[in-house]
Amino acid sequence: RLFRRQRQMCIRDSPYRCPPGPYERVSMTAHLLKAKNPTAKIIVADPKPKFSKMGLFQEGWGSHYSGMIDWIGSEFGGGSVSVDPDAMTVTIDGEVTKVDACNVIPAMKAGRICEIAGITEGNWAPVSGHTMQSRIDENIHVLGDASAQGDMPKSGYSANSQAKVAAMAVRGALTGSKVFPAKFSNTCWSLIDTNDGVKVGATYEATDEKIAKIDGFVSKTGEAADLRKATYEESIGWYSGITADMFG
């Protein structure tokens, strides 16, 4: 079924893990299909009116995979979706489509361990941005995807940044060492096609209410090919750096 005619992706509403992730997945699927079956179609059902790096992805889809990807946002029924796996059909806003493969991204929530600990409100675990301590049980620190912390996206970069704040807070509590004001950063890279990398990122600070965005940046549409290649290579360097940072 992988290389057949019709593929479908059903995306969830925010928040979810790695905001640009589904759209990079669409891009990589299109990259594969372009080589194996260039007549294939990818239909993307999305309950949101816009998404992370939307202009960049749509520009890339148009230039690399013209006519292959149809994105259906909330305005056109992207949030009204049902799936019949036995019949291999997807219904979008009442219209039934036969598909060869369907990737359904389910609703997300914090892991079971957070529920067992009793530190969730709704789907996520609220925390103080100053320390990443649970707002329900201060003896527990929560970071990364599971946390409801404010403006930071749920990403590996965010989790690593939050881990450093949590570690500093724990060290301060145990040893009495100085705890500096919490500062955070995040960058999310995405690959649209070979050597066509884009990114979005921001810096953040802790307030009493949440982790708040200070400023941000995003790749621009129409960038030169050498800049896009450099952005892709930057993402490879980041991965090498963050794995060394975590695991030595």
For each feature predicted by the language model, list its residue ranges.
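Single conserved hydrophobic/aromatic residue that forms the stacking wall/gate
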Residues: R1-I11
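A structural signal for isolated positions on well-ordered beta-strands in alpha/beta enzyme cores
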Residues: Q8, K41-I43, H141
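Cofactor-binding loop segments of dinucleotide-utilizing enzymes, especially the Rossmann-like FAD-
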Residues: R12-D13, P47-P49, D145
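Histidine-anchored nucleotide/phosphate-binding helix
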Residues: P22-A35
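A Rossmann-like FAD-binding core segment of flavoenzymes
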Residues: K34-N123
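Short FAD-binding loop at a beta-strand-to-alpha-helix junction that anchors the flavin cofactor
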Residues: Q133-M152
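A conserved FAD-binding loop/helix module that cradles the flavin
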Residues: A146-N186, S190-I192, G201
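C-terminal auxiliary extensions adjacent to catalytic cores
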Residues: G201-G248
